[in-house]
Amino acid sequence: MTTKIFLVRHAEAEGNLFRVAHGQYDSVITPQGYRQLAYLRERFREERLDAVYGSDLTRTHIASALYVPRGLEFRPLPLLREIRLGVWEQLSWGQIQRMDKQMYVDFNKRPDLWRVEGAETFAQVRDRTLEGIRQIAAENPGGTVAAASHGAALRTLLGTLQGMSLEEIGQTGHGDNTAVSLLEVEGDNIRVVFRDDASHLPAAVSTFRRQSWHKDDAATEPGLWFRVAAEEDGSRTEEALLEEEVFGTISMALEPEALRITDYQLVPALRGQRYGIQLLGQAVQYARTQGREALILRCPEELKGYFAKYGFVSSGAEMVMDLRRIVREIPSLG
């Protein structure tokens, strides 16, 4: 009796967009991620599903694209969580490269060697995700199931099921957000039918089409790191650096329920290269650590479209971004 398990990587989340390390940090889906979910829902429209599982992190709960149309309950399974990143959690990838370039490379290229304080090893991730798949198969004999998980966890699991060592897995590719893989489970045998298929995503909606790190031989990318330049009475200014040179600043002020961005600067040479969104991500991170539920800013009319892409909405003369961890409606296609 064969059980089919569709593995789905979660939609684009804040860590993917802002280039921040989110392993088991509970981040949320971006507006672009919700657009990806609309295409994922369409891909599975004619597919019978008997159950939908996912890790217990918020960004996989948005598998609602699969279970809500079918009247199914979401089944959280912590065994499918992303790798725990220890002291790397919530650091920008630029900061991590600056701290330990070799360990950053090992994370992508030599997972067998990767060791970080407070983190899991990839061997531990391999073992628990395998346990999760076997549990799903045992609970759904002969059924067809979808299971939502995470990039590094899925890469490790799929490579293992294809007979690779951890060292060999470091030479395999990465799956885009909402990429789909298919397993067939019969007894103790688990076969990978296909993996990392994101053909349902148009280029304009793909996360990977806008990023280069996954194409690089060492999986590196130029990334900003941040340092506090000034802080006083609820106001804070951070500098954004590449290597040791300052290329931008962001100034913020705490209000009772929100964080106000009072200044947002990036040198012209870096504009249009996805560095500006890393500045915005730093503000989101800081707002969350301070318990604020919104970002507020004022900007010229010609920049409102830019901020609207990332979830800001106009409110009078200002724009507001809602930071609450809530499940939003998946848009319709067309």
Task: Indicate residue ranges for each PLM-predicted region.
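Acidic, low-complexity terminal tails and accessory targeting/binding regions
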Residues: T2-T3, V87-Q95, T160-A229, R325-G334
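Conserved GNAT acetyl-CoA-binding A-motif
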Residues: A287-C299
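C-terminal "cap" of GNAT-fold acetyltransferases
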Residues: R298-E302, Y310-G334
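Conserved acetyl-CoA pyrophosphate-binding loop and the N-cap/start of the following alpha-helix
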Residues: Q32, L270, R274-Q282
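Phosphate-coordination/substrate-recognition cap region in phosphate-metabolizing enzymes
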Residues: A38-Y104
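A short, internal acetyl-CoA/4′-phosphopantetheine-binding micro-motif in the GNAT/acyltransferase core
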Residues: L79, Y264-R271
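Conserved beta-strand in the GNAT
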Residues: E239, E245-A253, R260-Q265
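Loop-to-helix element that buttresses phosphate recognition and phosphoryl-transfer chemistry
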Residues: R9-I62, V116-L130
